[in-house]
Design a protein with these regions (language model features):
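Divalent cation-coordinating acidic motifs and surrounding scaffolds
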Residues: 1-238
Length: 238
């Protein structure tokens, strides 16, 4: 996680939230920097199974300007959760994930997380375009919205034909940064489940990719599986 300035973690199931608090403390101590944390409520239609979205961000880089939870409905198993972050473009320091572009020193972006239910991924992703526009209206001063997460947008959950009919992948108003050919899983499957979708022409991004931590860190398949069954998807804002 030290690789990043802002991190979204999904599928947090710990009801007591001790694990996420421990991770927060470790981030602060191991990096030597202060990190902020903002989390959604516990989401899910079953009383026995709920998840949370959690954003971590370097306080040296970003400031939380607001958050928004899409209201509960039957449209999602776990409604999207968004944060608005004001961030410095690093006029005077060496981080390269947010950096000075020569004309601005501060920008604002909305980051939205969605963990789509596998067996209703297509219907949730159909609704996602509407939810993104809604969040853009909630935060009208932001440059735009970046929706991300495990969309389950591939293989048996969302076919190529089904994806072609989805507005987030077909409309000129949206930019999908992770290609269908990507593999975002750390196991034996080869599926582009995890995606990044940008809404708003003022959101400037580059270098979107899947971070294969197993290969980069030289981990065995067994160890990598203990870290996560998905690889992170990453991008740079400028």
């Amino acid at each position: 996680m030290e690789r990043y300035d802002v991190v979204l973690i999904q599928e947090v199931k710990d009801k007591g939230q001790t694990s996420i608090s421990k991770l927060w403390r470790l981030l602060n101590t191991t990096t030597g920097e202060d990190w902020g944390m903002v989390k959604s409520g516990r989401l899910g239609k079953s009383s026995r199974y709920k998840e949370q979205y959690v954003f971590f961000y370097r306080l040296q880089v970003a400031r939380l300007a607001g958050s928004y939870q899409v209201p509960e409905s039957r449209l999602y198993a776990r409604e999207p959760f968004s944060v608005q972050l004001d961030y410095d473009s690093y006029c005077e320091n060496d981080h390269d994930y947010f950096y000075y572009d020569g004309s601005h020193c501060e920008k604002t972006v909305v980051l939205m997380g969605l963990h789509a239910q596998p067996d209703q991924a297509v219907s949730e992703l159909t609704q996602l375009a509407t939810s993104i526009r809604r969040v853009a209206r909630v935060f009208p001063h932001a440059d735009g919205v970046v929706a991300m997460g495990d969309f389950n947008a591939d293989c048996s959950y969302a076919s190529e034909d089904e994806r072609e009919d989805l507005e987030i992948f077909s409309s000129r108003h949206f930019r999908s940064l992770i290609p269908d050919t990507a593999d975002t899983t750390s196991g034996r499957s080869d599926c582009a489940y995890d995606r990044v979708v940008v809404y708003g022409s003022d959101v400037m991004v580059r270098d979107a990719q899947v971070y294969n931590f197993r290969e980069d860190l030289g981990l065995s398949a067994k160890v990598a599986a203990k870290v996560s069954d998905h690889y992170p998807v990453e991008f740079k804002l400028y």
